[in-house]
Amino acid sequence: VESNHLGGICLNWGCIPTKALLKNADVFDIINNANKFGIEVGEVTINWSKIIKRSRDVAKRLSKGIEFLMKKNKIDYIPAQGRLIGKGNVETTDSNGKKALASANNIIIATGARPKWFSGIKPDGKQVITYKEAMILDKQPKSLVIIGAGAIGVEFAHFFQTFGTEVTLIEALPNILPIEDNDISVELEKIFKKRKMNILTNTKVTKIEKLKTKIKVHFQGDEIVEAEKVLIALGV
């Protein structure tokens, strides 16, 4: 039973499509540094819509592959929402509101994850976004504040900054990638700073102020950072 696309968050909106975006960034970086290898190239331009489309196509293709494997292995796939209604029983509701009953001796709940945000600071999908909107932006932002420097935050920081977005990365704990080994965190911070990324650690956001064409991010000490968009990447 699955109400969205087969493969869940990781395949459709997480690990897989973000790695496709990072591959685009790596190729762009290699081309821009080709002269170091004795290869001369002309002016390099990007097609943002194609960059985004490639990532989405990768996710769609793999999700379709899972659907094929379900059929091949004779696994019943019910595209619907499921709700436990008693021992061994799941009520399903499809997109048209049609209900049905599925029964089994054993039931596994594997419902995935959802974005986390501050109390009182909720994403609007336009100026204040989550990882999902960040993967399908129709236009590259000129500037971006990323709140949270875990795996999700640093991946998007690398991706957007490589393509020229001015990135500010904010983390409440002493290091970026706070749950990784300290030597990894320190080394990555050096790399990001060498690339002129603005990194603020030990920094807690107190307020997000939305204006017409920009956002002001307030943090302790009455400090403010302005950007076109804010990406909330808390938790992971």
Task: Give the ranges of each region predicted by the language model.
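Rossmann-like NAD(P)H-binding beta-loop-alpha module
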Residues: D138-E180
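Conserved NAD(P)H cofactor-binding loop of Rossmann-fold oxidoreductase domains
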Residues: T111-G112, T203, L234-G235
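The Walker A (P-loop) glycine that initiates the GxxxxGKT/S ATP-binding motif of P-loop NTPases
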Residues: V1-S3, I147-G148
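AMP-binding/adenylate-forming core of the ANL superfamily
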Residues: I107, E228-I232
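Conserved acidic residues
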Residues: Q81-R83, G150, T203-K204
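Conserved SAM-binding strand-loop segment of SAM-dependent methyltransferases
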Residues: N198-L200
